Structure formats: C-alpha cells, structure tokens
C-alpha cells in the first residue's frame, strides 16, 4: 500500500490511483474486513462471491449444478452486498460456469434477484473479461454471459468492465476492452467506463 500511495502522490496530476481489492463475503470476517478497510484507508472493495461461507470447506460457486446450490449463491451475494462494504459485484454470472447451459428458469430468476438487489442498493455489476483470456487454455467460456447480461440490461442495473488481472495482459489488451464496450452499447447510460467513488 505504501508504494501505491507514493505513486499516487507522485502522479496525482496525471492519473488518479485508488486502493482496494476483490474479496469474499465470509460472514465471520465482515467486522474484521470493515476494520481493516478503515485502518488502511482503502478506497473500495469488490465483492467476488466465489465460495460459500469460506474458501477451505465451502462450495465453489463456479461449480453450481443444482437449484439449491444456486439459491445459496444468490443468498450469499445479496447478504454480502447488503453489508455496504462493497462498491460493485464482480463476475455476477460466475454461477453460469457449470449451471447455466442452457439458461433455465431458476437461472433467470437468480439473475433477476441479483439485479434487483444491486439496483435497490445502487451497486453496479461487473462485465468481467477474465474468462476470455482463460478460455484458450480451458477451452470453455462461461462469462460474461450474454443471456445473463440481457437480464441485467432489462432490469436497469449499472455495469462496468473489469478483469481479474491474474495476468498483466488482461489489462494491456485494448481489443478486448473495445469489444466489451461495443457489446455494452445497448446499455446506454447504464454502462459506466469507470467506478464512481
């Protein structure tokens, strides 16, 4: 954090550098997370809802196959958003990895419920490009999911483009960003090109 803050001060007239990170909603750690955010003066946190309750024994939400598991994902995401700690919801369509082929009524209902929570709380959803970089390796692509994001558009939820940034190339690839921007044109004013803090 110190080096990032030093760079932010050094380049303050050229670029705005913020501090924050993606993290889970683990109920037992929310007080710790709130304290840590305040103590470190972080600008934002991103809700990346990957695991149910914890990452050691909890179910991975990218492996959802049943309606009951999907219900757990939605409940966890909504509870995380309701904490007020998070500035946006990362890859909200993560559950589509294994669940959504084809996108059934339970999947559509889950998407709608997530959208309604985000809209009520005024929290945008991320149109995450990470799987586009990963799919040449895994030979499968799960998100961003067009069916899911059509519901997001219909529900009037704000969206922004993001990547997991596991590799620097994910950030340095303007072609992927340009493609995503074109895909989000139907969102009109709901598409935001930056996180409003």
Regions found by a protein language model. Give the residues of each.
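Charged catalytic cores and adjacent phosphate/nucleic-acid-binding surfaces used
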Residues: 97, 102-197
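Extended substrate/RNA-proximal surfaces in nucleic-acid metabolism proteins
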Residues: 1-120
């Amino acid at each position: 954090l110190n080096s990032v803050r030093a760079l932010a001060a050094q380049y303050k007239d050229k670029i705005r550098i913020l501090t924050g990170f993606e993290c889970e909603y683990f109920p037992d750690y929310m007080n710790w997370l709130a304290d840590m955010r305040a103590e470190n003066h972080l600008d934002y946190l991103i809700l990346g809802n990957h695991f149910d309750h914890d990452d050691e024994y909890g179910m991975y939400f990218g492996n959802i196959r049943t309606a009951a598991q999907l219900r757990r994902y939605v409940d966890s995401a909504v509870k995380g958003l309701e904490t007020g700690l998070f500035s946006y919801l990362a890859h909200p369509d993560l559950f589509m990895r294994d669940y959504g082929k084809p996108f059934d009524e339970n999947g559509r209902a889950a998407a709608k419920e997530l959208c309604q929570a985000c809209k009520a709380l005024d929290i945008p959803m991320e149109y995450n490009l990470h799987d586009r970089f990963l799919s040449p390796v895994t030979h499968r692509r799960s998100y961003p999911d067009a069916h899911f994001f059509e519901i997001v558009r219909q529900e009037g939820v704000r969206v922004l483009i993001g990547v997991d940034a596991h590799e620097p190339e994910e950030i340095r690839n303007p072609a992927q960003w340009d493609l995503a921007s074109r895909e989000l044109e139907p969102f009109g004013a709901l598409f935001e090109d930056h996180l409003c803090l």
